[in-house]
């Protein structure tokens, strides 16, 4: 009942929003008549006119009707495609920083040109975000001619580009790229030593295609730039051998540590927890195999990391499956994207998990990595001044979009009514019965020449269906998604008569399945005037009619995904633009969703029906029960993403402080006064260790002098200061000022050996490198803290509050350590190293060999 009320409220709210925008759509349509009279040259001039009006005070909102009319008219002239009214609505919604839910085939790519053109008029840059490099290049190349016709520039930002090419791409009015590339560029920009090496401008407007995949599905995996660290990988092998000695609890989801067993597996959270019994056994095993001595405890600070390694090994064995989560190729573990089924050859799991899986599979164990920079996608996209997105499936995640990103979701009506027939789910007792029914459905589709798209949840299951079809000599395509361009071609042919296409549920998004197949043409005019093209067109029309007669594209879901939205995405491949189509999901009690998340009552009732071999059950009640199971998983995944964001918000505040400091250092020509300020702060801190109240005793003089000499090359005698001015005994502040002035004078004298240009570059390089060294150490220390902080829960402490508190103290300690080491290193360079290496520093700067210069600085830095 509550769900129906929420839906009713949401729909009525949606209708109100669309109704309020209707007048704006009418206004845009009226303006269309005036633009028909303009020549191409006159239409192009509109862009400069809009820019001038913005400059003199007009707002983007006031320009919207005219700007949308102009790009619609340009699209008609360039592509022969006129934006539908529903696409105009979508464009307005995107400009107003909302999520536009537009069904598959409704022309999201063309819709995006509307807000992209309008916001590009500001000159601040529009970033259109896609799921992969292929889609970024395809959409950029397709729309480039349209935007360039109107005087705007288009850039492409994909992996493998040079820094200069990336910089030029970001300088364009409209840039197409992938979410990861935008995020990694931001992190890389905050690791450079020179502002000229930055590629991004200030982040203004991001328009995200398939926004649910990028902001929801991929939000659980943070962006991480890592570098190798030297370490021994033997430990992973040795710990891996202990796993067989550990026994899982019988109730795999029960976290009450009363069950017999060494560890329990939480499949919902994808976590492994050790029981008290397990911890005792592990301690005995570590002693037995001589990891630790008999006298030592597992809980000693130097041994606690063994628990982390054992948990990694258990995760590798029980939660990460071959040909589902990863494949083995060329003696390497290659990650399979859980959402798309794509091979992620350039990525590795962090925190030692990848090494644990390598040990499990007995392949070469590569070195551990340390985190150099990290950020969640949530926090990256929240840096943009304006953010919006579009997808075919957003309404189920409307709450998350609003609570995390402050984005409202608006459902855009379809241009033509949806007539797809979504058939009820069929539930079988066993997987084999279900598979027989799926194969039978495919055979029937082939018999009536109906194209069928079979959606699976993993590569392994795709290959299993493929093997069964091969035995029956049924021609089919398997979408392995290794190459995005090949993926698009296979999807494009999936609408042809008799076509059988097997794909992971999310693969091929971004390419429409056209009934009869896609008819390729260079351009409309040339295509329809050639004799051969007319012949091809007639062939396509015949195929199109045949497919429509057979029932349109049929979708088969081989099991329910843990998210309703992913199921809707699969269904949404059929029934585009009012086309006929159908969909059916096949389930079994052995499916992951049913086994782990469906209620025991549902499974019990189905079993009591006494279904025979190859018999199935279908009922609206059953569909509701499955939906409830999916909602459970969705809520669980939302909690995981929310928790990830809450933890990252803590580090995000610290990251902002560090990145702001870096930017100030990079952009400032002279940081000498800043260094003198830090020097004064460190001297004051040092002196106050030896001062009690407002006076100091003579015994402290010698200890203080020694400390000042060691840290600041202070060669004066405090006694002589006191002999010269006896009031200093009682006026400690005056004495401190005298010591500070003396040391600062000495520092200035030594830096003046070279010109300001050289000394400033040295100061800047030291400051930046030490900042980076300690920030990297801090990131890894905080990550280690995060991995173990949940244990505080057993001591009746709030892990999240404890994490905030401890990470704050760690951050404060890091800032103090940075200041200490900056001063120590600069004094070492200017007071000691300059005596022998001064000319080397100067030569590197003069020759603009900055890599060698920074390396020389690094060698002179002595971290304590």
Swiss-Prot record:
Q: Gene3D superfamilies of this UniProt entry?
A: Helical scaffold and wing domains of SecA (1.10.3060.10), P-loop containing nucleotide triphosphate hydrolases (3.40.50.300), SecA, preprotein cross-linking domain (3.90.1440.10)
> For this chain's UniProt record, which GO biological process terms are given?
intracellular protein transmembrane transport; protein import; protein targeting; protein transport by the Sec complex
Keywords per UniProt? ATP-binding, Cell inner membrane, Cell membrane, Cytoplasm, Membrane, Nucleotide-binding, Protein transport, Translocase, Translocation, Transport
The UniProt record describes its induction as: Repressed under conditions of excess protein secretion capacity and derepressed when protein secretion becomes limiting. This is regulated by SecM.
Its top-level enzyme class, in one word, is translocase
Q: What is its EC number?
A: 7.4.2.8
Location in the cell reads: Cell inner membrane; Cytoplasm
Q: Per UniProt, where does ATP bind?
A: 87, 105-109, 512
Residue runs in coiled coils = none
Q: Which Pfam families match?
A: P-loop_SecA, SecA_DEAD, SecA_PP_bind, SecA_SW
* Membrane topology field: Peripheral membrane protein
Q: Which reaction does it catalyse?
A: ATP + H2O + cellular proteinSide 1 = ADP + phosphate + cellular proteinSide 2
**SUPFAM superfamilies given in the database record:** Helical scaffold and wing domains of SecA (SSF81886), P-loop containing nucleoside triphosphate hydrolases (SSF52540), Pre-protein crosslinking domain of SecA (SSF81767)
Gene Ontology molecular function: ATP binding; protein-exporting ATPase activity
The entry's cellular-component GO terms read:
cell envelope Sec protein transport complex; cytosol; plasma membrane
Primary residence: membrane
Under the subunit heading, UniProt states: Monomer and homodimer. Part of the essential Sec protein translocation apparatus which comprises SecA, SecYEG and auxiliary proteins SecDF-YajC and YidC.
Functionally, this protein is described as follows: Part of the Sec protein translocase complex. Interacts with the SecYEG preprotein conducting channel. Has a central role in coupling the hydrolysis of ATP to the transfer of proteins into and across the cell membrane, serving as an ATP-driven molecular motor driving the stepwise translocation of polypeptide chains across the membrane.
**UniProt xrefs under NCBIfam families:** PRK12904.1 (NF009538), secA (TIGR00963)
Family from the record: Belongs to the SecA family.
Protein known as:
Protein translocase subunit SecA
Source species:
Buchnera aphidicola subsp. Cinara cedri (strain Cc)
């Amino acid at each position: 009942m509550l769900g129906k009320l929420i839906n009713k409220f949401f729909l009525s709210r949606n209708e109100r929003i669309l109704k309020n925008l209707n007048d704006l759509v009418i206004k845009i349509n009226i303006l269309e008549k005036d633009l028909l009279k303009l020549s191409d040259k006159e239409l192009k001039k509109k862009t400069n006119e809009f820019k001038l009006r913005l400059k003199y005070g007009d707002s983007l909102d006031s320009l919207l009707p005219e700007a949308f009319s102009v790009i619609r008219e340009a699209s008609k002239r360039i592509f022969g495609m006129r934006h539908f009214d529903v696409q105009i609505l979508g464009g307005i919604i995107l400009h107003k920083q909302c999520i536009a839910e537009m069904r598959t085939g409704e022309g999201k790519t063309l819709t995006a040109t509307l807000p992209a053109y309008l916001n590009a008029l500001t000159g601040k840059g529009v970033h259109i975000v896609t799921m992969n490099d292929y889609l970024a290049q395809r959409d950029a190349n397709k729309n480039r001619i349209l935007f360039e016709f109107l005087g705007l520039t288009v850039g492409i930002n994909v992996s493998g580009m040079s820094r200069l090419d990336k910089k030029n791409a970001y300088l364009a009015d409209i840039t197409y790229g992938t979410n990861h590339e935008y995020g990694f560029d931001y992190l890389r920009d905050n690791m450079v030593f020179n502002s000229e090496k930055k590629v991004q401008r200030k982040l203004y407007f991001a328009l995200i295609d398939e926004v649910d995949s990028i902001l929801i599905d991929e939000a659980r995996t943070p962006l991480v730039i890592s570098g190798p660290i030297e370490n021994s990988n033997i430990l992973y092998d040795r710990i891996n051998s202990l796993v067989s000695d550990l026994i899982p609890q019988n109730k795999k989801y029960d976290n009450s540590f009363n069950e017999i067993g060494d560890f329990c597996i939480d499949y919902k959270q994808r976590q492994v927890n050790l029981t008290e019994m397990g911890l005792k056994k592990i301690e005995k095993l570590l002693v037995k195999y001589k990891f630790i001595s008999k006298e030592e405890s597992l809980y000693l600070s130097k041994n606690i990391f063994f628990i982390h390694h054992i948990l990694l090994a258990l995760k590798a064995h029980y939660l990460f499956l071959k040909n589902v989560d990863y494949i083995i190729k060329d003696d390497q573990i290659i990650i399979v994207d859980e959402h798309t089924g794509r091979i992620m050859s350039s990525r590795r799991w962090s925190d030692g998990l990848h090494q644990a899986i390598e040990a499990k599979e007995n392949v070469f164990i590569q070195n551990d990595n340390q985190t150099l920079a990290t950020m969640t996608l949530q926090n990256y996209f929240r840096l943009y001044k304006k953010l919006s997105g579009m997808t075919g499936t957003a309404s189920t995640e409307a709450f998350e979009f609003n609570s995390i990103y402050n984005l409202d979701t608006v459902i855009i009506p379809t241009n033509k009514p949806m007539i797809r027939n979504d058939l009820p789910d069929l539930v079988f007792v066993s997987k084999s019965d279900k598979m027989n029914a799926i194969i039978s459905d495919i055979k029937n589709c082939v018999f009536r020449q109906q194209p069928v798209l079979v959606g699976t949840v993993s590569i392994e299951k795709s290959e299993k269906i493929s093997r069964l079809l091969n035995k029956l000599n049924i021609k089919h395509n398997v979408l392995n998604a290794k190459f995005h361009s090949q993926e698009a071609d296979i999807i494009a042919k999936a609408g042809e008569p008799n076509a059988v296409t097997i794909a992971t549920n999310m693969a091929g998004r971004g390419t429409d399945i056209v009934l009869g197949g896609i008819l390729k043409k260079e351009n409309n005019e040339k295509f329809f005037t050639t004799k051969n093209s007319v012949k091809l067109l007639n062939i396509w029309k015949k195929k199109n009619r045949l497919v429509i007669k057979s029932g349109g594209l049929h979708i088969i879901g081989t099991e329910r995904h843990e998210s309703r939205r992913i199921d809707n995405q699969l269904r949404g491949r059929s029934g585009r633009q009012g086309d006929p189509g159908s969909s059916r999901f096949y389930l079994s009690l052995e499916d992951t969703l049913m086994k782990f998340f469906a209620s025991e009552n549902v499974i019990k009732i189905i079993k009591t029906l006494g279904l025979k071999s190859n018999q199935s059950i279908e009922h609206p009640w059953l569909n509701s029960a499955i939906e409830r199971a999916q909602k459970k998983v969705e809520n669980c995944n939302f909690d995981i993403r929310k928790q990830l964001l809450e933890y990252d918000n803590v580090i995000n505040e610290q990251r902002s402080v560090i990145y702001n400091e870096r930017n100030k250092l990079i952009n400032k020509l002279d940081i000498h006064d800043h260094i003198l300020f830090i020097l004064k702060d460190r001297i004051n801190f040092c002196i106050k260790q030896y001062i009690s109240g407002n006076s100091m005793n003579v015994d402290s003089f010698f200890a203080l002098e020694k400390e000042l000499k060691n840290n600041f090359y202070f060669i004066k005698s405090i006694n002589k200061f006191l002999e010269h001015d006896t009031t200093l005994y009682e006026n400690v502040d005056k004495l401190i000022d005298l010591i500070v002035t003396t040391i600062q004078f000495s520092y200035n004298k030594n830096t003046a050996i070279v010109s300001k240009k050289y000394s400033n570059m040295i100061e800047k390089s030291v400051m930046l490198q030490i900042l980076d060294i300690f920030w990297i150490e801090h990131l890894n220390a905080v990550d280690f803290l995060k991995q173990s902080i949940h244990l505080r829960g057993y001591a009746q402490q709030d892990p999240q509050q404890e994490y905030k508190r401890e990470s704050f103290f760690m951050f404060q300690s890091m800032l103090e350590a940075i200041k200490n080491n900056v001063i120590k290193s600069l004094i070492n360079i200017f007071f000691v190293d300059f005596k022998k290496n001064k000319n080397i520093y100067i030569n590197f700067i003069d020759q603009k060999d900055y890599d060698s210069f920074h390396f020389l600085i690094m060698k002179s830095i002595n971290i304590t």
